[in-house]
């Protein structure tokens, strides 16, 4: 029996159940074990709780043997690798884009100036301000239902959340607009899951690897390499999205490339620095480092640590 650790929220258990069911479909007995995390117990802003707020307790449960593996929202994992654990599988990714849920079915351009938009993500808030729509940003915590209710009860005019979470909970009908990357780059690894186990457990890692998706792993590797190089931690105003795309060479042959777009935004929205690059899936990390280097050349370091930004600021 493979014991799979998960946070207790509906979204987390739904995500972990997808992994459990996939393992069972492959002929492996599996069950979920709920683990309480600091991020679930606290209502404080995420950036004040430190890196690993949703993942530390799950990793402790792996280490002390309460569970054999854990399912994380990949974007919540610290960028620094922990030698005690290995990410044995990254399943196929859900849509990584951000989504707007607004009152009366409105899209962003229809919201009046001064409308209240909920998000506690510095990345979303910074890119929102950069759009220049005159919208007021308000803090947003709690599970997905709690967040959605703040729109339906009139407390907020709109909220911005990951489309992937809404999809996994069957709530896509609530989406009034899906934000394209040209409007808002998502958090690195948004929409992807990470299945982690003990580094020395090669037998389990082999079983879990049956669920790995090579294209998703390449994309997430590039995005997270960019984030790690920017030394931003998971709450800094950094966006990134990578995807495997088909190209055609001079002789008409189709081949695959890995495309990466990244940005760093001033928290007040006064500036957004963007860069992009093309590489291969086999050198995904190098692509992430190259795009990060371009962002640095364009002034990302000064923008991130300048006035109005701080080192602990998804």
From Swiss-Prot:
It catalyses: 4 porphobilinogen + H2O = hydroxymethylbilane + 4 NH4(+). Pathway: Porphyrin-containing compound metabolism; protoporphyrin-IX biosynthesis; coproporphyrinogen-III from 5-aminolevulinate: step 2/4. GO terms for molecular function: hydroxymethylbilane synthase activity. GO terms for cellular component: cytoplasm. Tetrapolymerization of the monopyrrole PBG into the hydroxymethylbilane pre-uroporphyrinogen in several discrete steps. The porphobilinogen subunits are added to the dipyrromethane group. Belongs to the HMBS family. NCBIfam families: hemC (TIGR00212). This is Porphobilinogen deaminase. It comes from Mycobacterium ulcerans (strain Agy99).
């Amino acid at each position: 029996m493979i014991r799979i650790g998960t946070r207790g929220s509906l979204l987390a258990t739904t995500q972990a159940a997808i992994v459990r069911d996939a393992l069972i479909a492959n002929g492996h007995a599996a069950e979920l074990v709920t683990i309480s995390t600091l991020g679930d117990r606290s209502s404080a802003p995420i950036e004040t709780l430190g890196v690993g707020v949703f993942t530390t307790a799950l990793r402790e449960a792996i280490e002390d043997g309460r569970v054999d593996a854990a399912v994380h929202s990949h974007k919540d994992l610290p960028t620094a690798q922990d030698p005690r654990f290995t990410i044995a599988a990254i399943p196929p990714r859900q849509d990584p884009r951000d989504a707007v849920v607004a009152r009366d079915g409105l899209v962003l351009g229809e919201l009046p100036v001064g409308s209240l938009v909920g998000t506690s993500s510095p990345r979303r808030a910074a890119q929102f301000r950069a759009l220049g729509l005159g919208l007021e940003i308000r803090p947003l915590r709690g599970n997905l239902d709690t967040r959605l209710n703040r729109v339906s009860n009139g407390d907020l005019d709109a909220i911005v959340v990951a489309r992937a979470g809404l999809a996994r909970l069957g709530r896509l009908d609530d989406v009034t607009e899906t934000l394209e990357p040209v409007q808002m780059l998502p958090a690195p690894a948004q929409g992807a899951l990470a299945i982690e186990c003990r580094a020395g457990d090669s037998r389990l890692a082999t079983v879990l690897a049956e669920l790995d998706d090579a294209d998703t792993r390449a994309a997430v590797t590039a995005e997270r390499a960019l984030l790690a190089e920017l030394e931003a931690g998971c709450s800094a105003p950094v966006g990134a999205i990578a995807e495997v795309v088909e190209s055609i060479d001079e002789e008409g042959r189709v081949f695959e490339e890995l495309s990466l777009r990244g940005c760093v935004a001033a928290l007040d929205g006064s500036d957004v620095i963007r860069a992009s690059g093309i590489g291969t899936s086999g050198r995904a990390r190098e692509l992430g480092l190259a795009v990060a280097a371009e962002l640095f050349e364009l002034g990302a370091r000064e923008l991130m640590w300048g006035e109005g930004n701080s080192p602990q600021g998804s």
